[in-house]
Amino acid sequence: MNETTRTYDVIVIGGGPVGENVAERVRAAGLSTVVVERELLGGECSFWACDPSKALLRPVVARADASRVPGLDPAVAGPLDVERVLAHRDRMSSYWKDEDQAEWLNSVSVDLIRGHGRLTGPKQVAVQTPEGDTVVLTARHAVAVSTGTRATLPPIPGLDTARPWTSREATTADKVPGRLAVVGGGVVAVEMATAWQGLGSQVTMLVLDNGLLERMEPFAGELVTDTLREAGVDIRFNTTVTSLDREGGQDGEVRITLSDGGQLAADEILLATGRAPQTRDVGLESVGLTPGDWLAVDDTFQVTGVDGGWLYAVGDVNHRALMTHQGKYQARIAGTVIGARAKGEPIHDAPWGAHVATADHAAVPQVVFTTPEIASVGLTSREAEQSGRRIEVVDYDLARVAGAHQYGEDYRGRARMLIDTDRNTVVGVTFAGPGVGELVHSATIAVAGEVPLDRLWHAVPAFPTLGEVWLRLLETYRG
């Protein structure tokens, strides 16, 4: 076993989209940079989350949309070609190989060390390589932790022998389970229930709460619930799993015992019950932090409670907004900040400035790729009420918009806009309905830009598109 030492201006632990973007930004600022990655460069999003899940979902959602269009419905009524869908998923995931990502990192002059990186003290990182060697790294300016999150599993008796799916297995499975039980009611649960039901699985959802997508506007979860049930998904609310047992070895069925004493059999069970930070084994104790904790940061993504201002936490690991696009937004800011501080340049810390994150508080967009799609940004009505602001809620039936008619018959959808009546700006928007994912950026601009309603009236939507809902919401507000 060999040990080598190297010194860089910046060390990035974690080579997912967030870590890659931090590295690219600080390298563009002229700082020597290295990325340490223990799995695949490109991270969870590229190989086990965003890319493979959307590849599974797209044909399911497209078929559902097409089935409403007169003249198309008989042509799309049959089953999907599962083999081709899974092959496309594999291509979208680059067959779980990261050579292209490594080539890109090299093209921006960032070094890569494969292995498990751990902090060993201020500005110090030790990397255990797959070959058993140790590389000791020292940072002149900063270390950025971008290790993301992992699935959390509840303490259910029989969990070890049941070998449940997490989100990773759900997005990478090579065959359709005949019966799939999904525990959870959040985004992963509803998206994977949508995907695998559409591919031919009999899906049962076991939901602890009394609704789906409980963190969003209630009508969003209600519409998804209706559509899943119409597709044949068995959804059981207020249900707890008390024990699991997989019978007959690896390929045996899973016996699920429920809190009401009932039992359920499934070929696979997906536990979509939350995420935890990947910080258990990155050496936090060496700098006075608690292993396994989320890393608290300020608006420049410096970790609080660590002397010297050299440690940054970017992306899901700081628990501000657990989405890839927000993590990349954070990375652009953090990389710019690190570069500025290394050069002794002033930090512009006013709201919406180049060196602070403001959108993570005010304008976080999200799309849930179910049938129907759900798209949101900013506050929900419940959050707005809790904030103490004076808010007016404006609702509109999306089926009444001319653009919805182009999606065929029986369009079901809803739009909600939240107006801060003191400031005369939009602070939250939620859309539910086919095709609404493409509306979320216009909503994000309205919220992030704090566009006054008097000016928003002059943003004329094209006819006939779903975007015309903006005009209808404004008309409804004015009465």
Model-assigned labels for residue ranges:
Residues R91-D98, T172, P177-A181, V187-G248, ...:
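Rossmann-like dinucleotide-binding cores of NAD(P)H-dependent redox enzymes
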Residues I11-E39, D51, A55, P59-A62, ...:
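Flexible, glycine-rich terminal cap/loop adjacent to redox cofactors
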